């Protein structure tokens, strides 16, 4: 995930200004966010290989009974837990670099039947409604489903890098949930021969308890599993 494409057009971050400028800093922020989510993304990629999973999902995949979700064309689910509201209109500059003076907010639909957390503020919203949220250039509207268990890591700068700190297991209360963390060597195809490990996490909302399942499997160079649990308030 996360690779810009084009023909005879600039794609590298340094083509969009210098560090400290609006566009450069926005791109850098989301590059770092992508690596922050790498344990989550990598686990979903494992599910794609082993279970024919779909990472980028129409809202109807998970909310087939929500009629309003059928009309939403600029949102998608990223795995089971994240709702991404793509900003599909220019907010800063128009044709020929004309400056646009418009509100930096975006309206998002939150599917019914669950609670949603604003990823940036942790504010909670009931599903089944449209909400207007801040959407400056460095903040794509992202919502997290109640019951989500999201593994993240700090300090990563490439996909197969081993985290220096324990993987954080972020829990968003409000419903039961589960997530399977997938791990392998990260730089070869040994997983096709069984060299990988999975760990199932379960959140019991009524008890406020996160269950850490047994780590199943192994691969060369596998480190001892150490996790840090964070419960979002």
PLM feature segments, named:
Residues 1-138, 181:
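Catalytic-domain carbohydrate-binding cleft regions of carbohydrate-active enzymes
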Residues 137-233:
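Accessory, solvent-exposed terminal regions and/or long lumenal/extracellular loops of proteins
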